[in-house]
UniProtKB/Swiss-Prot annotation:
Keywords: Signal. It comes from Oryza sativa subsp. indica (Rice). InterPro entries: Pollen_allergen/Os. This is Uncharacterized protein OsI_030282. On the 2D-gel the determined pI of this unknown protein is: 7.1, its MW is: 19 kDa. Residues 1-16 form the signal peptide.
């Protein structure tokens, strides 16, 4: 019985600490949000461009290859979103990464439907190389 009470008290103490940490994090996040708005906006715009490009590639795919194209574009999309996430915290890296992927996405969106998949594959690889070089 004493062991159960001790475990219960430990759980209550741990949850109280976690609640305090969560509250502090929310206050800090709201405070920093105003300072980081331009960076967040760049990341959001780049993510939106990446998703629009990937969606246009899937929409342009022939019905027979739709599943294959969707899987390949999902993979490219995840690499791009991961690169954006890794750039967070470094304003220069955010600028370089978001610009590289916005250019790649624009090229895909401007391409003819038959060329969208190939162009996405090539332009997103170029974007990765630009990000690595920066």
């Amino acid at each position: 019985m004493a062991k159960a009470v001790a475990l219960l008290l430990a759980a209550i103490a741990a949850s109280a600490v976690l609640v305090q940490v969560e509250c502090d994090a929310a206050v800090e996040k709201s405070f920093n949000k105003a300072l980081l708005a331009p960076v967040d906006k760049r990341l959001d715009e780049a993510a939106q461009a990446i998703n629009e490009a990937a969606d246009s590639v899937v929409a342009a795919a022939p019905p027979a290859k739709k599943d294959e194209v969707e899987a390949a574009t999902w993979k490219r999309r995840m690499f791009a979103i991961t690169a954006l996430g890794m750039a967070q915290g470094d304003e220069k890296k955010v600028a370089a990464t978001s610009l590289a992927y916005k250019k790649a996405a624009k090229a895909v969106l401007d391409a003819a439907p038959a060329d969208k998949f190939k162009l996405m594959d090539e332009s997103f690889k170029v974007a990765v190389m630009q990000v690595i070089a920066s």
